[in-house]
Amino acid sequence: TESLMRTAMRSSTRKEWKTLFYLDNFQTPLTKNDAGNYTEPLEMLRLAPSDKNTQPWRVLKSGNCYHFYVTYKSGISREEEIIKRVDAGIALSHFHQTVLELGLKGYFKQTEPGNVGLPKNTNYITSWYTE
């Protein structure tokens, strides 16, 4: 069953963990060890479907907080931007549903961090605070 799901979701062509998840800045990849109890929710986010398998989301862990971003090139059409944001929303849902299933405590809050060396074309969405 897992093999069938991975094929259907094109999981073997998903971006690597180190290109999606970061620790304190966008130059330092987040390790699964650093993610701790949030390894599985982040993995479910990584495996979430996206248009053309682009996986436009990025996550930055800072302290007890996970900041979520969406990436897209400047100059894309409004429709393409909306699709990227919908993809990120679906991925966030995968993250949140896994958090709930695991019984992890936390909450979403709009608090964009400053001074994190935000890469070009990377746009803040929301943050998840762990408890």
Task: Locate the predicted segments by residue.
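Acidic, surface-exposed loops and disordered segments
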Residues: T1-E131
